């Protein structure tokens, strides 16, 4: 197994087998501006028999302060919208690669050969400096915003977890 690690938002993710990970943000298609304004998660990884779309954030806005100013309200909505867009765009791009609608030369044979009709797809946001009480709030907001996409792709779960939980789950070193 050739190991792969990556640093995102001040956290070291991995070590993953290089055949288990697709660095969507580092792909040529993404880097070459294939689609302007495309927003993606950090990477897609085959982890513990699940396909995980993983986004990393260093912190969240404090949702309890959203009514304190127009700027705080805008930051709050931008945070939710940004993550939702990243998951939507990433799922669309990834599955266009898997189905061969776009060149999939950067995707490992292992990922290409998974039986996508049977695997669980999970959306994960790892937040380094999370307000613990805000994780459920943000998860619920993202569930509402992503419910259609989650139904289309039969995604059962979205998780917002802090760095400590990510370490216990084997995402972060």
Question: What is each residue range found by the language model?
Answer:
Residues 39-41, 52, 121:
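Residue-level detector of short, conserved catalytic/binding motifs and their immediate flanks
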Residues 43-45, 52-58:
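Conserved catalytic cores of phosphodiester-cleaving nucleases, focusing on short active-site segments
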Residues 59-126, 148-154:
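Catalytic cores of nucleic-acid endonucleases
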Residues 132-173:
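Polybasic (Lys/Arg-rich)
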Residues 127-131:
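Short beta-alpha junction loops
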Residues 38, 46-49:
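Short, flexible loop/turn motifs enriched in small residues
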Residues 1-41, 171-173:
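Basic, amphipathic N-terminal segments that precede the first structured/catalytic domain
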């Amino acid at each position: 197994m050739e190991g792969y690690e990556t640093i995102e938002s001040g956290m070291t993710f991995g070590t993953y087998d290089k055949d288990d990970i697709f660095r969507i943000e580092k792909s040529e298609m993404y880097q070459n501006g294939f689609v302007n304004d495309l927003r993606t998660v950090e990477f897609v990884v085959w982890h513990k028999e699940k396909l995980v779309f993983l986004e990393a954030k260093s912190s969240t806005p404090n949702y309890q302060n959203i009514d304190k100013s127009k700027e705080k309200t805008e930051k709050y909505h931008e945070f939710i919208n940004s993550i939702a867009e990243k998951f939507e765009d990433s799922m669309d791009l990834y599955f266009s690669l898997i189905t061969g609608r776009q060149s999939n030369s950067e995707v490992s044979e292992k990922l290409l050969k998974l039986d996508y009709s049977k695997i669980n797809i999970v959306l994960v946001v790892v937040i380094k400096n999370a307000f613990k009480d805000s994780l459920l709030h943000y998860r619920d907001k993202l569930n509402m915003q992503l419910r259609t996409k989650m139904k289309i792709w039969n995604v059962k779960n979205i998780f917002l977890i802090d760095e400590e939980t990510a370490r216990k789950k084997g995402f972060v070193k």
